[in-house]
Amino acid sequence: MSKKPVRVAVTGAAGQIGYALLFRIASGEMLGKDQPVILQLLEVPVEGPQKALKGVMMELDDCAFPLLVEMTAHSDPMTAFKDADYALLVGSRPRGPGMERAELLAVNGAIFTAQGKALNAVASRDVRVLVVGNPANTNAYIAMKSAPDLPAKNFTAMLRLDHNRAASQIAAKTGKAVADIEKLTVWGNHSPTMYADYRFATIGGESVAQMINDQEWNANVFLPTVGKRGAAIIEARGSSSAASAANAAIDHMRDWALGTNGKWVTMGIPSGGEYGIPAETMFGFPVTCENGEYKIVEGLEIDAFSQERINITLAELEGEKAGVAHLL
């Protein structure tokens, strides 16, 4: 018995991340090899991006993906999000030369207010939303606050790229396989202030913290490397990390939809007050996923160094929140 197709809306669909993402959604990597999909693709109402989107759709056609039932191109979120079961909000305004962060927040605030309102109006009442476009946590917060009729818990921000970057650095440091790393998490904002935390992590049942046993490396090499990895990639490649971001989006949605089998992953989610994080703050937490729902891993001890790092990333998020308060 074949499954009923689900509707997946993707914004910024003709952009670099969109291009790295859509083929993997259509091939079944995100929702499973037995789950047919309908792609509802949104781009800005400008000739260039709309034309580019048509080209991407031609390529998707040419892949003859068995699971891709239908796809549509849109310039209006009110049609793009119609009955969407999943929405990946990839498109955002990047920071231009000489642009202040406050300006960036304002420009994106307008985009995500409109998209939140559109989701509220027309998406499935159970839509699962992932915000990839930066500043991801605050954009997700804006979308959530603009969609009062949808469950707040269905709005998430992407911290998985930071999580995967941290796992990769730990694998390189220990000489172990990245697939064997468990119980790693990233707290806070998707920004250089994020706190990648391997205090509870294990590889083959052994403590990663004991294996590495080097607080100097943790504070002065590991955390800055993970935090500034995006900038390092722009420096090396001449453009931003698109394929790794798309890969993280696939990981995030797959785990949310299909479950993590008890493994910890990191998701940016609205706080319920856990670990002293103010309610509704869109914050990276350790979670497990089962039956389409995520659950925060509770009861972890927060030592002095960790508390200090969590406070730094929280302060940044509170500042961003204050910066967009007038939009909501």
Curated annotation (Swiss-Prot):
Residues the record lists as binding NAD(+): G12, A13, A14, G15, Q16, I17, G18, N108, Q115, V132, G133, N134
Claim: Oxidoreductase is one of the keywords in the record: yes
Catalytic activity: (S)-malate + NAD(+) = oxaloacetate + NADH + H(+)
Pfam families: Ldh_1_C (PF02866), Ldh_1_N (PF00056)
Catalytic residue list: H190 (proton acceptor)
GO molecular function, one term: L-malate dehydrogenase (NAD+) activity
Binding site for substrate: R95, R101, N134, R165
EC number from the UniProt entry: 1.1.1.37
CDD domains: MDH_chloroplast-like
Gene3D superfamilies found in the cross-reference section: Lactate dehydrogenase/glycoside hydrolase, family 4, C-terminal, NAD(P)-binding Rossmann-like Domain
HAMAP family per record: Malate_dehydrog_2 (MF_01517)
Family recorded in the similarity comment: Belongs to the LDH/MDH superfamily. MDH type 2 family.
Name of the protein: Malate dehydrogenase
Purpose: Catalyzes the reversible oxidation of malate to oxaloacetate.
Annotated gene: mdh
Keywords, in A-Z order: NAD, Oxidoreductase, Tricarboxylic acid cycle
GO biological process, one term: malate metabolic process
